Amino acid sequence: EIGSTIPNATFAYVPYSPELEDHKVCGMPTSFQSHERWKGKKVVIVAVPGAFTPTCTANHVPPYVEKIQELKSKGVDEVVVISANDPFVLSAWGITEHAKDNLTFAQDVNCEFSKHFNATLDLSSKGMGLRTARYALIANDLKVEYFGIDEGEPKQSSAATVLSKL
């Protein structure tokens, strides 16, 4: 709901470092709490069902990478791509998307953040288990300013839509 406070959830990620560009190097995951990290900041959270999946890789995440400077020019402090994937997979995906340290790729641990918004998908029939739905959220000082969810192709959760809401 617009104006509501985002949940204080745990996210796990591998911080970017140039050494990770060598695909044989594996970074060490760490975690953060949403309230601690995002208090006083404007954050765009982009949730995807899965790293390296066709729609997420081809259509959803690349425009966020391409438009990062435009997003930052509109006051965005951080863009975070979240999914149920483990932080190692998300780190590798961020590298292949050429995101460097411009975006954070983080695991929504047990989908707790997404569950708060009823934005999860049970993809057990496809062998993928519980996943985050495809959505985008703008939070400003922990308050929801925009929430857009998609069932198929990115529309409400696209970079273009998010930019129009900033």
UniProtKB/Swiss-Prot annotation:
One of its GO terms (biological process) is cell redox homeostasis. Residues 1-166 form the Thioredoxin domain. The active site is at residue 56. GO terms for cellular component: mitochondrion; peroxisome. It catalyses: a hydroperoxide + [thioredoxin]-dithiol = an alcohol + [thioredoxin]-disulfide + H2O. PROSITE patterns: THIOREDOXIN_2. Its EC number is 1.11.1.24. GO terms for molecular function: thioredoxin peroxidase activity. The keyword Disulfide bond applies. It is an enzyme of class 1 (oxidoreductase). A motif (Microbody targeting signal) lies at residues 164-166. Thiol-specific peroxidase that catalyzes the reduction of hydrogen peroxide and organic hydroperoxides to water and alcohols, respectively. Plays a role in cell protection against oxidative stress by detoxifying peroxides and as sensor of hydrogen peroxide-mediated signaling events. The active site is a conserved redox-active cysteine residue, the peroxidatic cysteine (C(P)), which makes the nucleophilic attack on the peroxide substrate. The peroxide oxidizes the C(P)-SH to cysteine sulfenic acid (C(P)-SOH), which then reacts with another cysteine residue, the resolving cysteine (C(R)), to form a disulfide bridge. The disulfide is subsequently reduced by an appropriate electron donor to complete the catalytic cycle. In this typical 2-Cys Prx, C(R) is provided by the other dimeric subunit to form an intersubunit disulfide. Homodimer; disulfide-linked, upon oxidation. This is Putative peroxiredoxin. It comes from Malassezia furfur. The lineage of its organism: Eukaryota, Fungi, Dikarya, Basidiomycota, Ustilaginomycotina.
